[in-house]
């Protein structure tokens, strides 16, 4: 694959507003390429290279940090892939996907005017404002990865819809549950936030002003959602606790699902590893 200049790639990824600003960032030592500081703006780098900026917040919202943690933990590479982001809001997940080289992102949210301007004007972003994902039967093209950060709706409802957007996974060896193995060409995947406050029953959600602290409820919610995902054709490949708490201090989790791929069904093992008392 042909390499490209670092300053041009920074602009293309949306990490710098102009080539001049990209060059300034590089000369200031604020750009890392695959973890290493690069001081030449003209350096030839791979289009799939990981680029990191060490100045200010990395993403337009804290959601980007949550998704980054999941991508790192699961070993999922999004470079060159077509993605959809459900519940985009300000665009933290979308921003993270673009910074990691996504070719295109369908940014979907029921609200309007929420998406950060730099994402709203990025040609790689298809803005889908005032759009309720549960009623979107299909997208203009099949996507390889769907990220979900939705509130006031069960993830189970959304999984029933987004599986119709995904490109089917080709046959592949079955990796050990919880290990990496994601990457280009692996087919349809989902990385979704599981929010117990929107999955538990009304009685549980009403306690403590909507903050669920009971590990027993966390376990029940995770087991229920992941078992449902399996029943709908998703293999559960990984599960982590979000590095950041949700609104009001709720514990949240990130699940990695692959569509139409065999699973060895060790949900109980994964759930046990992320429960708060085991952290």
Annotate each language-model stretch with its function.
Residues 89-94, 111:
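Residues at the N-terminus of the alpha-helix immediately C-terminal to the conserved SAM/SAH-binding loop
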Residues 167-188:
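Intrinsic disorder/low-complexity segments
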Residues 251, 256-279:
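Flexible, glycine-/basic-rich loop-and-beta segments that form/coincide
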